[in-house]
């Protein structure tokens, strides 16, 4: 039989790792964005691929948030994690529509949200 605290700690650790990966992805993407802004082709493709990877990482982080939210009863971090994939989908759509300035502003909002999710997950006490 599994100890509830151990299972809850595992879910929190899963959330922490997923949030860390999402934060790293969100930091890499603007570094590659200098390519599309300057008209460089290969960086433009890499920026798009990292953006799609960020969406997948945001989904994984949201799963971690759901698991932690159910185990701990704390829904705040769960809803923060659930906002990341939504922001990522909107971000991808804006990039595909070539709405550059809105894409850049929302990109920084996504970066802040991903880094904040990781730092908040680090601060959460173990259940």
Question: Model-found features: residue ranges?
Answer:
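Polytopic transmembrane helical bundles with strong interfacial aromatic enrichment
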Residues: 1-127
